[in-house]
């Protein structure tokens, strides 16, 4: 049989959940309303920053008032929502290129290219187009497509970097260096590379980041970086606010705040979790374990570090899932692992229906799956065929 009974049940549940998420996400106007008025989604923040950079005012991308005015240029009307641009100035070059298009074509280009890169990385990890289709079904992928966020870029860059690490370490380092566009996703990369003795990749990553910073300073000027630094301080203050919608933060900090814990105590717990993630990553990458498990562990631990992560960032968990599948193709499938992967995706999907930090549960589930696999070694596998 192509599928066991358990696999068929998993597929049926997955399809049903997928349909529910589609109805939840797309059951209303998207980008363009029935009256022809454009809607603002997260991508407008990137477009507006690129519009300002292209007009010769890159530092204005980090000025809330000027950035909000640029929203109007893209939408053709004022928007009640303001989507900031909290990314390093070297991201402005890509944003400016996108802003040469109108808002909707730029959005379509951004989503199409990021989804293609994500699927390409997934296929490279799993080793088959069918595996890439599975990766496309992750609920976090839908969120990124719907609002034009950058979670697919994060997953693609991390995936490309890890899949190339053993074969082409310098190219891998370039991909991992590019991940610095979102520092909270890249923080554990140096830990893993140092622990694993991946010195060529580490050097390539460091040189990539240095080149991006130098080029940005030369083109956009020091004032743009100063404006970026000032905005980071404002974001830090926002996280500590007592009236923050903490359900959107898919982190331990967000979960504890949602349960009523004061900001300072929740942040202390988050720092402890980050320290544990750093230690776990170092241990995993120092051990002579299968590379696929090391990569899966890094992807899962990555989302335990920062207090500032949202549902679209959970696309990074698909890198962990892809490497777990890659490992299982060689070592054999394990029923606990399969249930863990399904449970993690259900937890991510639950965010769309509840606006609560169930993404933390998904991260912890996959972390447990990785640690268990490392402890067990190579158990007898189930008779479930690999994706082909």
Predicted feature locations:
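Primarily membrane-embedded glycan-assembly and transfer machineries that use lipid-linked glycans
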Residues: 1-171, 193-330, 378-388
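General helical secondary-structure elements
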Residues: 5, 20, 178, 335, ...
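Membrane-interface alpha helices of multi-pass inner-membrane proteins
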Residues: 170-194, 298-305, 344-350
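Aromatic-enriched
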Residues: 325-388
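Membrane-embedded alpha-helical segments of transport systems
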Residues: 181-184, 211-215, 338-340
């Amino acid at each position: 049989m192509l599928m066991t009974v358990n696999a068929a049940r998993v597929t049926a549940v997955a399809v049903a959940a997928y349909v529910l998420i589609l109805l939840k996400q797309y059951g209303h106007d998207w980008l363009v309303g029935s009256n022809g008025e454009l809607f603002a989604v997260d991508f407008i923040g990137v477009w507006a920053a690129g519009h300002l950079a292209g007009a010769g005012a890159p530092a204005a991308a980090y000025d809330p008032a000027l950035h909000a005015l640029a929203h109007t240029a893209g939408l053709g009307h004022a928007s009640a929502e303001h989507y900031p641009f909290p990314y390093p100035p070297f991201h402005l070059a890509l944003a400016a290129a996108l802003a040469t298009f109108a808002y909707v074509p730029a959005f379509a280009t951004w989503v199409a290219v990021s989804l293609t890169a994500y699927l390409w990385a997934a296929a490279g990890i799993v080793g088959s187009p069918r595996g890439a289709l599975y990766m496309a079904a992750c609920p976090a992928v839908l969120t990124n497509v719907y609002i034009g966020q950058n979670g697919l870029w994060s997953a693609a860059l991390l995936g490309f970097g890890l899949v190339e690490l053993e074969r082409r370490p310098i190219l891998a380092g370039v991909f991992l260096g590019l991940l610095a566009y979102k520092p909270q996703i890249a923080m554990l990369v140096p830990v893993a590379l140092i622990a694993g003795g991946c010195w060529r990749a580490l050097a390539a990553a460091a040189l990539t980041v240095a080149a991006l910073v130098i080029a940005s300073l030369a083109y956009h000027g020091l004032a743009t970086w100063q404006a970026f630094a000032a905005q980071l301080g404002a974001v830090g203050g926002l996280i500590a606010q007592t009236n923050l919608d903490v359900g959107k933060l898919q982190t331990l900090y967000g979960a504890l705040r949602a349960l009523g814990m004061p900001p300072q105590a929740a942040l202390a717990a988050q720092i402890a979790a980050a320290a544990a993630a750093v230690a776990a990553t170092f241990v995993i990458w120092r051990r002579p374990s299968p590379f696929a498990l090391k990569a899966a562990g890094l992807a899962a631990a990555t989302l335990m570090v920062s207090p500032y992560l949202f549902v679209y960032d959970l696309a990074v968990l698909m890198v962990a899932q892809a490497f777990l599948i890659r490992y299982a193709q060689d070592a054999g499938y394990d029923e606990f692992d399969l249930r863990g992967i399904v449970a993690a995706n259900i937890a991510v999907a639950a965010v769309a229906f509840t606006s609560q930090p169930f993404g933390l549960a998904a991260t912890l589930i996959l972390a447990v799956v990785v640690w268990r696999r490392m402890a067990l070694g190579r158990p007898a596998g189930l008779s479930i065929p690999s994706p082909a």
